[in-house]
Amino acid sequence: MNDIIKKIQNQIQNNPIIIYMKGSPDAPSCGFSAQAVHAISSCGKKFAYIDVLKNPDIRLELPKYANWPTFPQLWVNGELIGGCNIILELFQKGELKKTISICDKLNS
């Protein structure tokens, strides 16, 4: 296992909610990342982020590790939830907040 994969695994394990995105929550660099961050932020939970534009090694390796080719990628409690379309679908159904609130139960 290479060092980048180990780094990704550590990030996912050490952050109950993490999004790999283009840009930052305050300044997303693509529309998909902006939409995903808006939906996640609306749930009222703190989350970590990794800007894949500033981390080209992660941008290259994460799609292979996750078996998910695009960004953003939302991970909750070590599991890949999905990209922008899935995040928005869960948000519109009211399920994203439930998915994210599981972190409170598991970490209490």
UniProtKB/Swiss-Prot annotation:
Show the Pfam families listed in the entry: Glutaredoxin
| One cellular-component annotation, GO | cytoplasm
- Kindly list the places in or outside the cell where this protein is found, as annotated in its UniProt entry: Cytoplasm
Superkingdom, natural source: Bacteria
Residue stretches making up the Glutaredoxin domain = 5-107
Provide the GO MF annotations for this entry: 2 iron, 2 sulfur cluster binding; disulfide oxidoreductase activity; metal ion binding
Indicate whether Magnesium appears among the record's keywords.
no
List the SUPFAM superfamilies hit by this protein, alphabetically. Thioredoxin-like (SSF52833)
Question: Where along the chain is glutathione bound?
Answer: 22, 59, 71, 84-85
Q: Which UniProt keywords apply?
A: 2Fe-2S, Cytoplasm, Iron, Iron-sulfur, Metal-binding, Redox-active center
Q: What does this protein do?
A: Monothiol glutaredoxin involved in the biogenesis of iron-sulfur clusters.
Instruction: Report the family membership.
Output: Belongs to the glutaredoxin family. Monothiol subfamily.
- Kindly provide the name given to this protein in its UniProt entry: Glutaredoxin 4
Give the originating organism: Buchnera aphidicola subsp. Baizongia pistaciae (strain Bp)
